[in-house]
Amino acid sequence: MRPLTPRQAEILELIKRNIADTGMPPTRAEIARRLGFKSANAAEEHLKALAKKGCIEIMPGTSRGIKLTQENTEDADLGLPLIGQVAAGEPILAQEHVEQHYKVDPAMFKPSADFLLRVRGDSMKNIGILEGDLLAVHKIQQARNGQIVVARVEDDVTVKRFEKKGNKVFLHAENEEYSPIEVDLANQSLSIEGLAVGVIRNGDWQ
């Protein structure tokens, strides 16, 4: 199989997770919404590229007409991908970020988890998110005040409590030793990579 671009790998992982969670593939509109595309047409172009590379089959005439090839059907049974160090500028679910897969049922979290992120540092220790824990993350592009999010500020990925005030976003630590990260949306880049939906204590799942 020809190598995938980071974005193609991210879409393929989303398809696998949706099938694992719901028993069916996502629609083009759902892919576009989950990954922040402006239209379903953008998702369609990526799906065509995945089909050309032998990862999926596209069945015309239905909004969920996406079928994993046998190789990728087997991969979908591996479990949730564990994301380690995230390279600057790369999609968080790019294949090179996946350290391994864990046999965890995504549906045990509400909403269901799309991936696990290895926690680095102690900035969220006061709410029980500790160094080395595996944070279960539901991939979504928007957040409400008070939610714990995985956010990308410029090229750095961080786990913090989200608060938006006007044109500014404050990312709050749950550790008094850390000051909030202030992001001025007028001149700084911020994107939400997902919502924290649970924690697996380091060592609980091997």
UniProtKB/Swiss-Prot annotation:
Subunit and interaction comment: Homodimer.
Gene name of the encoded protein: lexA
Coiled-coil zones: none
InterPro entries per UniProt: LexA, LexA-like, LexA/Signal_pep-like_sf, LexA_DNA-bd_dom, LexA_repressor, Peptidase_S24_LexA, Peptidase_S24_S26A/B/C, WH-like_DNA-bd_sf
Pfam families, per the entry: LexA_DNA_bind, Peptidase_S24
EC number: 3.4.21.88
Enzyme class (EC, first level): hydrolase
Classification via NCBIfam families: lexA (TIGR00498)
Listed GO MF terms: DNA binding; serine-type endopeptidase activity
Superkingdom as given in the UniProt entry: Bacteria
Name of the protein described by the UniProt record: LexA repressor
Site (Cleavage): 88-89
CDD domains: S24_LexA-like (cd06529)
DNA-binding region, residue intervals: 28-48
Function: Represses a number of genes involved in the response to DNA damage (SOS response), including recA and lexA. In the presence of single-stranded DNA, RecA interacts with LexA causing an autocatalytic cleavage which disrupts the DNA-binding part of LexA, leading to derepression of the SOS regulon and eventually DNA repair.
PANTHER family: LEXA REPRESSOR (PTHR33516), LEXA REPRESSOR-RELATED (PTHR33516:SF2)
Keyword DNA damage tagged: yes
Catalytic activity: Hydrolysis of Ala-|-Gly bond in repressor LexA
